Amino acid sequence: LQLGFLKLLRGTGLRLEAQKYGYTYVDVAPYEIFSNNVLPFDDIVRIKHAEDVLEKYWNAHRMDATIEYLVTDVFDTPFDFFQGFGTYWEERGWSRIGHQLEDLFMRLLDFLSTLPHVDLGIVKTLMLIDYFKPQSFIPRKTWWTERVAEDQLKALYAAIRQDATVAGEEFAAMNVSEKDLFKHSLIIPSSISYKDLQKERVVKQDGYLFIYFRQGQTPYMVDIKL
């Protein structure tokens, strides 16, 4: 998705009529406008703020499920999300520093935590799914804080060891050894149904998400419960 800004190039009809429509603009390349008689300077600045996060979060496809949920179910319009987040981003000076992948997730969560109408449980689960999807191995950096209680974690792994179909028929067919089970999998708290997410529906459901990382493949994920 490209967010472009009107330019008054030399020799164009619009530039010749700039005064008629109240355009103010940069008189040297790239000739971008500052304002006109219907779009004040402050609105241009707000749109500019949206540009940076649009590129990093939507066009880069780093967290498609999360952003789709936010622009569809949480914010009134996609622009409301990108503009609001973009302004928050700019106010904190993040546009002037570099960002690791993990930083992008934490910065979005930081913004959403300031809003009263956001279900952070759903958002955090979607963010983790987006974060894990391109990974072939368990990530070394654990930027998230949600953990399964130790006794619950032991019980869940014990159930999978006893009957692999607890993690689904597809996982059972992999014949994963106990060593690889512990070496290449994670279990995290979940606030949505992963089964429904695969059908492009976000359905709130408290439980656990099992992730098995496979070299060269997308991780296997499934809802599990005791």
What are the functions of these language-model segments?
Residues D52-L226:
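Radical SAM enzyme core and accessory elements
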Residues L1-F81:
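A structural motif corresponding to the C-terminal lobe/cap of the Radical SAM core domain
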